[in-house]
């Protein structure tokens, strides 16, 4: 137990004392670095707090996982994300909500899952973390278990850019306005009078999303990744409302892959 106590005290020292030790007001770049470090400390703390919930699942089988769930907490599923957006609890039978950093893999038993689903999450991970997570998904799935991925179809964005299709931008703007503001009001650091003037600015949002997107996928490189980690049957799929929901922006701007173990 001594190493665990040492780790805990070390994290507490970082979390509580770092800002006091650094003159963060002197340099905005230092402030950003401190915030990044605090986020990593918070992720480490969340991983520790999640241990008990994962331990409860170690002897379970036939699990359904929803990875990177955000606010999409599904009844009867194990819903995992670093921050679960709507604060939903676990009142429904068989429903689990676990706040956990999926860069750390899946602390579940092998062959314990019947279905693993993830929508618009994998692109938020660096490639090295994404492929490691997919390898762990393969390990955790039972034989014949299904992995289903929904990912942003960046080809649509790039085609619109190359063809100068402002109609595509206007349609996306209409659908996305409730989440991102009309005219992508949240393009950070851009003077208001410049917003919406150049299509490349929209492409910056589509591809990078304020730096949150780390990796671009298409059918080809996602399929190659899944095959590399052991999936033997990887197929393109169309939208399935029973699994993918009815959100318009996800329906129109996603591609889907599913793979069997």
Give, region by region, the residue ranges found by the protein language model.
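Short, flexible, glycine/charge-rich loop motifs used to bind or transfer phosphoryl groups or to couple energy/partner
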Residues: 53-55, 68, 87-88, 106, ...
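Non-catalytic N-terminal targeting/anchoring module and adjacent flexible stem/linker
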Residues: 1-65, 137, 232, 238, ...
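Conserved SAM-binding loop
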Residues: 60-159, 220, 257-261
């Amino acid at each position: 137990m001594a190493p665990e106590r040492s780790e805990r005290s070390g994290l507490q020292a970082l979390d509580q004392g770092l800002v006091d030790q650094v003159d963060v007001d002197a340099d905005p770049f230092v402030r950003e670095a401190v915030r990044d470090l605090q986020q990593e400390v918070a992720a480490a703390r969340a991983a520790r707090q999640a241990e008990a919930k994962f331990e409860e699942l170690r002897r379970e089988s036939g699990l359904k996982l929803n990875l990177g769930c955000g606010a999409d907490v599904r009844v009867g599923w194990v819903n995992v994300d670093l921050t679960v957006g709507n604060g939903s609890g676990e009142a429904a039978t068989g429903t689990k909500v676990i706040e956990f950093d999926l860069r750390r893999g899946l602390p579940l038993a092998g062959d314990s899952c019947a279905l693993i689903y993830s929508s618009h999450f994998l692109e938020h991970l660096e490639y090295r973390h994404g492929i490691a997570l997919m390898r762990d998904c393969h390990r955790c799935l039972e034989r014949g278990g299904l992995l289903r991925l929904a990912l942003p179809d960046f080809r649509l964005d790039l085609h619109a850019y190359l063809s100068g299709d402002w109609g595509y931008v206007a349609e996306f703007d209409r659908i996305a306005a409730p989440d991102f503001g009309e005219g992508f009001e949240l393009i950070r650091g851009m003077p208001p009078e410049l917003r919406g003037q150049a299509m490349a600015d929209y492409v910056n949002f589509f591809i990078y999303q304020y730096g949150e997107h780390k990796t671009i996928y298409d059918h080809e490189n996602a399929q190659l990744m899944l095959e590399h980690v052991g999936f033997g049957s990887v197929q393109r799929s169309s939208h399935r409302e029973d699994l993918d929901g009815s959100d318009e922006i996800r329906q129109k701007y996603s591609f889907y892959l599913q793979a069997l173990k």
